Amino acid sequence: MKVLEGSVAAPNAKVAVAIARFNSFINESLLEGAIDALKRIGQVKDENITIVRTPGAYELPLVARRLAESKKFDAIVALGTVIRGGTAHFEYVAGEASSGLGKVAMDAEIPVAFGVLTTENIEQAIERAGTKAGNKGAEAALTALEMVNLIQQIDAA
């Protein structure tokens, strides 16, 4: 029986990190976690990491699509924070960011790791950006690297 499973060490991977500026006080912690994970655990070199800043989470799918179409990257990590408010805006932004990023991954056949927090309140966002609930930016970065390695294994099988 053959079992394929990716590892997180990917020293030659070229990774784009698309990060929303809106809610930057949370997103910068996600970015720090992602970069730390890429470099320390994934062993990705500085010169192989590109950071692209978007106005908000809604814009992440278009930027991810352009990054994927450039064929310069092995994976994309999308980071942002959408916090529920008193209107339906949350559902629109969170839903479009999620489905749009998933579509990019499927259409471009490149790992697009979803590191967009969708929380009920700011406390939940803070917990997921490096406190009680870990750092979801770091988790997304490691997911991206694992998928890069897994896809390479599938292609070689």
Swiss-Prot record:
Its EC number is 2.5.1.78. The keyword Transferase applies. The active site is at H89. The keyword Amino-acid biosynthesis does not apply. InterPro entries: LS, LS/RS, LS/RS_sf. Pathway: Cofactor biosynthesis; riboflavin biosynthesis; riboflavin from 2-hydroxy-3-oxobutyl phosphate and 5-amino-6-(D-ribitylamino)uracil: step 1/2. Keywords: Riboflavin biosynthesis, Transferase. 5-amino-6-(D-ribitylamino)uracil binds at F22, A57, Y58, E59, T81, V82, I83, F114. One of its GO terms (biological process) is riboflavin biosynthetic process. One of its GO terms (cellular component) is riboflavin synthase complex. (2S)-2-hydroxy-3-oxobutyl phosphate binds at G86, T87, R128. It is an enzyme of class 2 (transferase). Forms an icosahedral capsid composed of 60 subunits, arranged as a dodecamer of pentamers. This is 6,7-dimethyl-8-ribityllumazine synthase. It comes from Haemophilus influenzae (strain PittEE).
